[in-house]
Amino acid sequence: MGTDSRAAGALLARASTLHLQTGNLLNWGRLRKKCPSTHSEELRDCIQKTLNEWSSQISPDLIREFPDVLECTVSHAVEKINPDEREEMKVSAKLFIVGSNSSSSTRNAVDMACSVLGVAQLDSVIIASPPVEDGVNLSLEHLQPYWEELQNLVQSKKIVAIGTSDLDKTQLEQLYQWAQVKPNSNQVNLASCCVMPPDLTAFAKQFDIQLLTHNDPKELLSEASFQEALQESIPDIRAHEWVPLWLLRYSVIVKSRGIIKSKGYILQAKRKGS
């Protein structure tokens, strides 16, 4: 592990961007020993194991090149969708903005997901509410730059349908009235409300917006938890220099049977000052 960690640390010290993708978690086999109790635990476990697996397979060529963008993945778990089976699959994603205030993160995440899965478009993308400062309520202004980019992606046929997460009736109504491409779904966290709010239910029914449930924490990946996972996997690194920009979780479901064929995480991180 020592030599692996030193090589990985040297690469990360020179790179400016890290692209981490887990591949299909259902293909992990021996890497997946325990069943995590929360989404945050699963994610942290995935980040660490992906980093460990990647650092154990660093080639001498990579060390000589010192690439600016590092592609970190579990190679044996990568699984593209067979083009002949694409029509039978529903490809969904949820995008979490972590440390980025750039709407281009949305396009980067969708482009990378399409590339990883070998598809031309995603069937649905839900955006988690972007982070806001403590004491500040999420407003339409916070959502607009990300939604504009999602609309562009729908218009360029990169995404079929787009949705929101954790918007109350007022927020959803404001977005709906402003948006060119309307949200077709809104996720509600059942931990915060055991029963769907009646005003939200009525509005969603009126405008044909699907209300879904989720159990993601308010902050699935924090800067601190990412840096801790990085430090534990690769001790020879200045982990505090790295900031996660966004995280995308995807799933591929066989439409006719409702079973999950593939699921995984993709994230992008930047080194501060690079």
From Swiss-Prot:
Pathway: Sulfur metabolism; glutathione biosynthesis; glutathione from L-cysteine and L-glutamate: step 1/2
InterPro entries: Gclm, NADP_OxRdtase_dom, NADP_OxRdtase_dom_sf
GO MF assignments: glutamate-cysteine ligase activity; glutamate-cysteine ligase catalytic subunit binding; glutamate-cysteine ligase regulator activity
Gene3D superfamilies membership: NADP-dependent oxidoreductase domain (3.20.20.100)
GO cellular component, one term: glutamate-cysteine ligase complex
Modified residues (N6-acetyllysine): 263
Family (UniProt): Belongs to the aldo/keto reductase family. Glutamate--cysteine ligase light chain subfamily.
Protein's recorded name: Glutamate--cysteine ligase regulatory subunit
